Amino acid sequence: MHLSPQEKDKLLIFSAAQLAERRLNRGLKLNYPETVAFLSFQVLEGARDGKSVSQLMSEGTTWLSKKQVMDGISEMVDEVQVEAVFPDGTKLVTIHNPIN
């Protein structure tokens, strides 16, 4: 199987996001890498589902709360930027202050 660097990155994000989701389901708080992976994966999947950049930027602030992440993580993650593939091409999605 031959994967491009971007495809390898997406698989890594998927694996980390899956781990993060399992930990959330068990009631554990997410650390920094898990938080970024979880948010990034939501953007990638939203783009795949046909959502617009503006929809993802708006929804992105509702995916995680401060209660779901370790202390200090919400201050560390002031924005998340993800290049996602949309039907009309690749676009950069930026979510400002994603953890409320």
From Swiss-Prot:
Domain of life per record: Bacteria
Temperature dependence: Optimum temperature is 55 degrees Celsius.
Alphabetically ordered keywords of this record: Cytoplasm, Hydrolase
InterPro entries from the UniProt entry: Urease_gamma (IPR012010), Urease_gamma/gamma-beta_su (IPR002026), Urease_gamma_sf (IPR036463), Urease_subunit (IPR050069)
GO term, biological process aspect, one: urea catabolic process
One Pfam family recorded for the sequence: Urease_gamma
Regulation: Inhibited by HgCl2 and acetohydroxyamic acid slightly by EDTA, but not by boric acid or L-methionine-DL-sulfoximine.
GO CC annotations, alphabetized: cytoplasm
Record localization: Cytoplasm
Reaction(s) catalysed (UniProt annotation): urea + 2 H2O + H(+) = hydrogencarbonate + 2 NH4(+)
Protein family: Belongs to the urease gamma subunit family.
Quaternary structure note: Heterotrimer of UreA (gamma), UreB (beta) and UreC (alpha) subunits. Two heterotrimers associate to form the active enzyme. In most bacteria it is thought that three heterotrimers form the active enzyme.
Protein name: Urease subunit gamma
Organism listed in the record: Prochlorococcus marinus subsp. pastoris (strain PCC 9511)
Highest classification ranks of the organism: Bacteria, Bacillati, Cyanobacteriota, Cyanophyceae, Synechococcales
